[in-house]
Amino acid sequence: MEAAQGRLGPEPELSVGAEHQAATFSGRPSRTPSKPPSVRTLSGEEEAESVGVSSRHPRASPKTWSGSIAHGPELDTWEDKPSSRATPSGARGRRGVPGSEHAPPPSSWYPEPEPSEDQPSALRVCRRGSPGGVEMNVELPQQEGDDDDDEDEEAAAGRAGRSFPSRLQDSRSLDGLSGACGGGGSSSSGETGAGGGRRATISSPLELEGTVSRHGDLTHFVANNLQLKIRLSGAPPPVPPASVRPCLTPAPTPTIPPIDPDVLRDLERLSRELGGRVDRLLRGLGGAVQELTALSVGCIQTYRDAVDSLGEAVDMSIKGMYTLLARCEELERALQPVQGLARQVRDIRRTLEVLEALCK
């Protein structure tokens, strides 16, 4: 692509290049005399810019176009510099056709017919040499990868349920992204230069599901509608309605084996025995609880009777003590005359002693 479309000449000769370009897109030969453009070697950035500019022209027109460029005496200079013209690789190589020494035939004035879909169009550069100059027919095709990309996009969009306008918009945005990534890369890549802006991203299904960008060795993928995809992936499959279900579908075979009736009878008998034992256990437990309750009631009554009898005994003792005190007081009052008698007895005894002494 760089060999076919780059190196049109310096900036001061843009008017001449515009006239040739107008004659080329109109499909008719240019009748204005042209000046031989000076040939110069472009740097990597200028080559990338020329590739980006030229890659947009084939997309503008789906048909191939042919241009006629007449060169003057600088033919030898142009052919002697192989380093300034890079031969495209792959199917876009230069196919030289030996031209006549006379003017180009009238058939080259009009655009050539479109190539078929099965046969990919290629970049064709034909040199027709003449003593006065050289004529070069350049046929710039549409990108050969567009058909494959469109088929992949339609298939992936059909699976994802996206509409055709959204796929076209994604394709255009990805083309612009690919052009930006390709313009920032190295100019020595032959495949990028020969592809004419072909996508530098990864497979088409990823491009349809989101945005893919490359920064050096890293590839970034941003999915569209990530929350919706997560919700759809986690949603249970819808149950078909009853009207849609087939009526003649065979019933599923039971996975449980048939039950033996003897097992059921044994299970019933064992259940009854277990129930009887549980009933007897509950009855015994109830009787034991009743006995414990009666014993507890007897203990409580005995304690109450003991407390009552103890209280009565204490009351009787208290009453006896008070009665004894009262009797003691009565006895003291009754013994008061005895003290007088004791005094009289002492007086009589003294009198007797005096009489006994007089008698001696």
UniProtKB/Swiss-Prot annotation:
Residues 179-198 have a biased composition (Gly residues). GO terms for molecular function: identical protein binding. It is found in: Lysosome membrane. Residues 1-201 are annotated as: Disordered. Keywords: Lysosome, Membrane, Phosphoprotein. Residues 23-33 have a biased composition (Polar residues). Residues 144-155 have a biased composition (Acidic residues). One of its GO terms (cellular component) is cytoplasmic side of lysosomal membrane. One of its GO terms (biological process) is regulation of endosome size. Its main location: membrane. The modification Phosphoserine is found at S130, S173, S204. The modification Phosphothreonine is found at T41, T201. PANTHER family: BLOC-1 RELATED COMPLEX SUBUNIT 6, BLOC-1-RELATED COMPLEX SUBUNIT 6. Component of the BLOC-one-related complex (BORC) which is composed of BLOC1S1, BLOC1S2, BORCS5, BORCS6, BORCS7, BORCS8, KXD1 and SNAPIN. Belongs to the BORCS6 family. As part of the BORC complex may play a role in lysosomes movement and localization at the cell periphery. Associated with the cytosolic face of lysosomes, the BORC complex may recruit ARL8B and couple lysosomes to microtubule plus-end-directed kinesin motor. This is BLOC-1-related complex subunit 6.
